[in-house]
């Protein structure tokens, strides 16, 4: 099945080549942009798909699938509107081709469905004969495929017939009335036969009565001649002739009484039959009226059928217009929402521009802060290098100071020892001086002691000389300590300053990062809103185009409604003229009916004038003045009278044909009696 359908769709693509389009249309990829299809629709139905509509189709599409989708959607919507408004056919939404698949994937199945709908437009347009002849001139295989596509479209168009319970009920009533009429016509035929038989019997009895009257006159005449040629003479009492005549008279009186009784019986029968005939005539008249009413009902049924079809068409059109109105209202709401959003976006853009201006001023400050931070970083690096150098010098000085302190402690300990020895020696010398002289002391002291004393003296000299260096070292140490304290103070101040600068730097970095984040967010919001504004503007342009299309469609519908109103007025005037020609007594009724209709039109016009915006909308939507009830009755009566006259003429012509000379006796006997009342000749007596 799918291969057959694809073959049909390929033949439809080949059929497009017959139309001689300017756009490329040789394969599915070339047809997916919708330009060739739009040109084909403009060529097929220029009254619907005008040059203005064709100008809305974008030509240079390329590989932009969004523009392809918009073109295809416009084409599909135009085809559906053409089927609904021009061809009066409602297509289901299941048959709507998918524009996305055609534009994105170049789907041949969906494109074939769209081509099938365009073929339906070509076959049902004003110049359909031209396109049908073009199709007939193609190859047989192409003709078969195109005919299969048309059969599929016709199968889609076929609708289910509506339920007609009321029509079935009326048809059943008509059948029963026809059966009653046939039975009554049969009874009338039988009574007519009986009447003919009685009329023949009556004529026979009248002939016999005339014969008897002639015999009586003959016997009463005195100059009568008998059978043997002799004159019978006058009749006298007691004669045989008188007796014979008397017998004959008595017998004739008896026969006369019998004939009179038979005549009275026949009169009674004929009166009964006349009553039956009158009843049957009344029934026949009733049946004729019933048949006329049935004909009227049939006509009404036909009118109601047409009205029902028109009503369905109007309902479908009304539903489409309602949908279009709802879409129009939704579009209005969307336009209002978009206008509000655009106003909000403009306000936000202005705010963002102001913020951007502020941020541009802040950018200069941030750059200044950056430069200051860079300078502070350079200063901090130099200070750090200085602090490292001072720390290194401080460590060296501490090492030297510790070595000097150790030497000082050693020297102090040795000084103490030497002092003790000096004191001991002084004490020893004083004692030696007191006891003996220097020779004794020299003799008493050993060489070791002398050596030790000499060594101590030398060391004392050295210590005295070293004590002068120690004072210099102590001064140097004090100076180094002062410098160290100064450096410590400077280092503390530098550390504090470094901490403050680092804190300021961190704060500046955090503020800068916050500002950068805010700037990034503001720029992203600005880009998003600019993109949203662009999308809203594109949607606004699309909505403006849709509104323009809808307004053009509404203007066309208004023109159609005005044309329908003019046609309706012409029909009303024709109906009035027909009524005047049929029944001149209805002129006054028509004049009386015109006045309330004019009053109703004036009141409806005043009501529509005072109805405000909603009434103007409804008047533009409908545009039709409502028909008055009396005008409808007037048109209905005129139509029924015309139908009755036409029916009577048809029945009379049929009876004239049936009563022709070339009919048999039985066929003439089966014919119904004429509708005029019968005047019986024997009813006078």
Curated annotation (Swiss-Prot):
Highest taxon of the source?
A: Eukaryota
Q: Which Pfam families match?
A: HOOK (PF05622), HOOK_N (PF19047)
Residue ranges annotated as coiled coil are 134-570
Q: Which InterPro entries match?
A: CH_dom, CH_dom_sf, Hook_C, HOOK_N, Troponin_sf
Spell out the GO cellular component terms annotated for this protein, sorted alphabetically and separated by semicolons: centrosome; endosome; microtubule
Q: Which GO terms describe its molecular function?
A: dynein light intermediate chain binding; microtubule binding
Cytoplasm listed as a keyword: yes
Subcellular location(s): the record lists: Cytoplasm, Cytoskeleton; Endosome
Region ranges (Disordered): 430-449, 593-625, 661-685
Q: In what ranges is there compositional bias, type Polar residues?
A: 661-670
Low complexity: which segments have biased composition?
602-623
Residue ranges annotated for the Calponin-homology (CH) domain, each copy included: 6-122
Main localization is cytoplasm
Q: Which UniProt keywords apply?
A: Coiled coil, Cytoplasm, Cytoskeleton, Endocytosis, Endosome, Microtubule
What is a biological process (GO) this protein takes part in?
cytoplasmic microtubule organization
What remark about domains does the record contain?
The coiled coil domain mediates homodimerization.
Its assembly, as annotated, is:
Homodimer. Interacts with microtubules via its N-terminus.
Record-stated family: Belongs to the hook family.
According to its UniProt entry, the function of this protein is described as:
Involved in endocytic trafficking. Probably acts as a cytoskeletal linker protein that tethers endosome vesicles to the cytoskeleton.
Q: What is this protein called?
A: Protein hook
This chain's source organism reads Aedes aegypti (Yellowfever mosquito)
Q: Top-down, what is the taxonomic lineage of the species of origin?
A: Eukaryota, Metazoa, Ecdysozoa, Arthropoda, Hexapoda
Gene designation: hook
């Amino acid at each position: 099945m799918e291969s057959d359908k694809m073959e049909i769709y390929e033949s439809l693509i080949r059929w497009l080549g017959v139309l001689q389009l300017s756009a490329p249309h040789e394969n599915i990829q070339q047809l997916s942009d919708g330009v060739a299809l739009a040109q084909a629709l403009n060529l097929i139905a220029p009254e619907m798909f005008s040059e203005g509509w064709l100008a809305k189709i974008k030509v240079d599409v390329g590989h932009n699938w969004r523009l392809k989708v918009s073109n295809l959607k416009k084409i599909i919507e135009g085809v559906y509107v053409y089927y609904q408004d021009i061809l009066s056919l409602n297509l289901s939404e299941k048959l709507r081709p998918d524009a996305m698949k055609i534009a994105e994937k170049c789907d041949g199945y969906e494109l074939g469905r769209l081509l099938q709908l365009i073929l339906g437009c070509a076959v049902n347009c004003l110049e359909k004969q031209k396109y049908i002849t073009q199709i007939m001139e193609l190859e047989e295989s192409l003709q078969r495929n195109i005919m299969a596509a048309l059969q599929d479209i016709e199968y889609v168009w076929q609708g289910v017939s509506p339920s007609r319970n009321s029509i079935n009920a009326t048809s059943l009533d008509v059948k029963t009335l026809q059966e009653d009429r046939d039975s009554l016509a049969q009874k009338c035929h039988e009574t007519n036969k009986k009447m003919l038989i009685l009329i023949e019997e009556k004529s026979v009895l009248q002939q016999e009565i005339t014969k008897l009257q002639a015999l009586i006159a003959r016997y009463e005449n005195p100059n009568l001649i008998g059978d043997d040629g002799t004159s019978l003479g006058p009749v006298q009492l007691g004669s045989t002739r008188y007796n014979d005549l008397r017998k004959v008279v008595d017998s004739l009186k008896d026969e006369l009484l019998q004939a009179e009784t038979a005549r009275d019986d026949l009169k009674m029968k004929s009166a009964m039959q006349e009553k039956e005939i009158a009843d049957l005539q009344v029934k026949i008249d009733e049946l004729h009226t019933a048949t006329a009413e049935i004909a009227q009902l049939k006509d009404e049924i036909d009118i109601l059928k047409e009205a029902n079809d028109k009503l369905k068409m109007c309902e479908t059109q009304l539903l489409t217009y309602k949908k279009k109105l709802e879409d129009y209202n939704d579009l209005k709401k969307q336009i209002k929402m978009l206008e509000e959003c655009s106003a909000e976006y403009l306000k936000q853009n202005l705010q963002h521009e102001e913020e951007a201006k502020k941020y541009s001023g802040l950018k200069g400050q941030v750059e200044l802060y950056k430069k200051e931070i860079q300078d502070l970083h350079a200063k901090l690096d130099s200070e750090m290098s200085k602090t490292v150098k001072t720390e290194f010098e401080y460590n060296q000085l501490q090492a030297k100071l510790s070595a000097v302190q150790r030497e000082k402690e050693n020297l102090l300990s040795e000084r103490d020892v030497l002092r003790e020895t000096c004191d001991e020696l002084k004490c020893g010398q004083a004692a030696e001086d007191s006891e003996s002289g220097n020779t004794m002391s020299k003799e008493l002291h050993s060489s070791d002691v002398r050596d030790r004393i000499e060594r101590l003296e030398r060391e004392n000299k050295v210590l005295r000389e070293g004590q002068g260096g120690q004072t210099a070292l102590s001064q140097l140490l004090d100076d180094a300590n002062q410098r160290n304290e100064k450096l410590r103070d400077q280092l503390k101040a530098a550390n504090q300053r470094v901490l403050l600068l680092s804190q300021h730097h961190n704060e500046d970095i955090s503020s800068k990062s916050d500002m950068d984040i805010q700037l990034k967010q503001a720029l992203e919001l600005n880009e998003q809103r600019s993109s949203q504004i662009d999308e809203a503007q594109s949607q606004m342009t699309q909505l403006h185009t849709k509104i323009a299309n809808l307004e053009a469609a509404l203007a066309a519908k208004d023109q159609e409604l005005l044309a329908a109103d003019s046609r309706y007025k012409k029909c009303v005037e024709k109906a009035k003229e027909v009524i005047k020609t049929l029944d001149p007594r209805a002129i006054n009724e028509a004049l009386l009916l015109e006045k309330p209709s004019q009053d109703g039109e004036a009141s409806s016009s005043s009501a529509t004038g005072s109805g405000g915006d909603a009434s103007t909308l409804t008047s533009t939507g409908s545009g039709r003045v409502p028909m008055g009830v009396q005008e409808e009755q007037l048109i209905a009566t005129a139509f029924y009278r015309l139908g009755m006259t036409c029916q009577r003429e048809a029945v009379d012509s049929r009876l004239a044909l049936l009563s022709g000379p070339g009919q048999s006796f039985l066929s003439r006997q089966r014919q119904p009696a004429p509708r005029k009342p019968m005047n019986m000749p024997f009813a006078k007596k």
